[in-house]
Amino acid sequence: MSRVTLSRYLIEQTRSNNTPADLRFLIEVVARACKEISHAVSKGALGGVLGSMGTENVQGEVQKKLDVISNEILLEANEWGGHLAGMASEEMDNAYQIPGKYPKGAYLLVFDPLDGSSNIDINAPVGTIFSVLRCPNEYLSQNEALNEKAFLQPGTEQVAAGYAIYGPQTMLVLTLGDGVKGFTLDREMGSFVLTHEDITIPASTQEFAINMSNQRHWEEPVTRYVGELMAGEEGPLKKNFNMRWVAAMVADVHRILTRGGLFMYPRDSREPSKPGKLRLMYEANPMSFLVEQAGGASTDGHQRILDIQPEGLHQRVAVFLGSKEEVERVTAYHKK
C-alpha cells in the first residue's frame, strides 16, 4: 500500500471535507518552511546557528540566532503565495503586512517560529507552533492596511493549527478541525508522511508536566493539586504520578498527545499583572485546538482557553491542558 504524504492527505481533505484549496496550499507552504527550519536546527554548531543574537524580542526574552532565522524562513516562505492577508509572530512587535507587490489572501497566519529555543544549545527538542485564522472581510481589500485587531479572534475561530517538532525525528502534527494527524519527515523522500492516523489523548493519566522550581510562586489551588499528585497512592487521588519537564511546550504537549498526561504552566506571584507566561495567540490557542481535537481539554484554570477573547497580540495566559479528567480536576480547584 502506498504511503500517504501530507500533500495527498490535504488533497483528499479538499475532495471529501471541502477543505478550501487555498488553505491546503497554505499548509503545504508552512510545512516546507518547517522542513527548512528542521535543516537549520540539525546543523547546530556546524552551521554557526547556536548562541544568542544579543537582542530581545517584544516579550523581553533574549533572542537566539535560530529564533531570528526561523522567523525569517516563515515570513519569506509565506509572504508571496497569495494565501495570506498578514502574519503575526511571537518574535515581532506588530503584525506583518504582506508586501504590496504580492496578492492578498483570505487567511492570517500566527506562529511561534521556534518554541523552546533555550534548548537549542543543549541539543534538546524544539519546535514551531502555528495557527490559521480567517481574515475579517474588512481587511481583505488589497489597499486596506492590516492592524492588530484583525488577529484578535478567540481560538474557536481557528481553521487549522499544528506544530513541527524537531527531535530524533521531525514530525508535523496537524488539525483542520476534524481530528489530529501526525506526519513524519522522510528525509529520503523529502516529504512528510502520515504515520499517526488518529491521535487521541486518554481521558485519565498518571503523568504530569510542570516546572517545580516555581512552586513557591504558585497560587493555592495549584499548590494543593500538585501536592495531591505528589502524595501518590497514599494521597486523595489514590494513585502514583510521574513528572516530566522538557522546558519546551511543543515537546511536552507532543508527549501528551502521544501517550496522555497533563501540562501545566500556571500564573505565579512574581508578575501579578501577567496572568501567565505562555502566549495565548502563538502557543495556548493552537495547542488547545490540537488537544481538544484529540479528545483532551484545555483551560486557564477558570475557563476554556479557546473561549478567551484576545485583547492583544502578545497576551499571556495560564495553561492547564491534556487528559480531560485531570484538567477538569485542577480547574475545579480554582473555582472553590
Swiss-Prot record:
Sorted alphabetically, which InterPro entries does this protein's record hold? FBPase_C_dom, FBPase_class-1, FBPase_N, FBPtase
Residues that bind Mg(2+) 1, according to the entry?
E90, D112, L114
Chief localisation class: cytoplasm
Report residues binding substrate: D115, G116, S117, S118, N211, K277
Q: Which GO terms describe its biological process?
A: fructose 1,6-bisphosphate metabolic process; fructose 6-phosphate metabolic process; fructose metabolic process; gluconeogenesis; sucrose biosynthetic process
Gene3D superfamilies from the xrefs? Answer: 3.40.190.80, Fructose-1,6-Bisphosphatase, subunit A, domain 1
How is the cofactor bound, as the UniProt entry phrases it? Binds 2 magnesium ions per subunit.
Where is the protein situated, by its record's location annotation? Cytoplasm
Q: Does the keyword Metal-binding apply?
A: yes
Q: Which GO terms describe its molecular function?
A: fructose 1,6-bisphosphate 1-phosphatase activity; magnesium ion binding
User: Where does this protein act, in terms of pathway?
Assistant: Carbohydrate biosynthesis; gluconeogenesis
Q: Recorded E.C. number(s)?
A: 3.1.3.11
* Pfam families for the chain: FBPase, FBPase_C
Q: Report residues binding Mg(2+) 2.
A: D112, D115, E283
Q: Quickly give the catalysed reaction.
A: beta-D-fructose 1,6-bisphosphate + H2O = beta-D-fructose 6-phosphate + phosphate
GO CC, any one term = cytosol
rRNA-binding recorded as keyword = no
- Give the protein family: Belongs to the FBPase class 1 family.
Quaternary state and interactors: Homotetramer.
Matching HAMAP family: FBPase_class1
Check the record and name the PANTHER family matching this protein: FRUCTOSE-1,6-BISPHOSPHATASE-RELATED, SEDOHEPTULOSE-1,7-BISPHOSPHATASE, CHLOROPLASTIC
Could you identify this protein by its name?
Answer: Fructose-1,6-bisphosphatase class 1
The record lists the organism as Pseudomonas fluorescens (strain SBW25)
Q: What is the lineage of its organism?
A: Bacteria, Pseudomonadati, Pseudomonadota, Gammaproteobacteria, Pseudomonadales
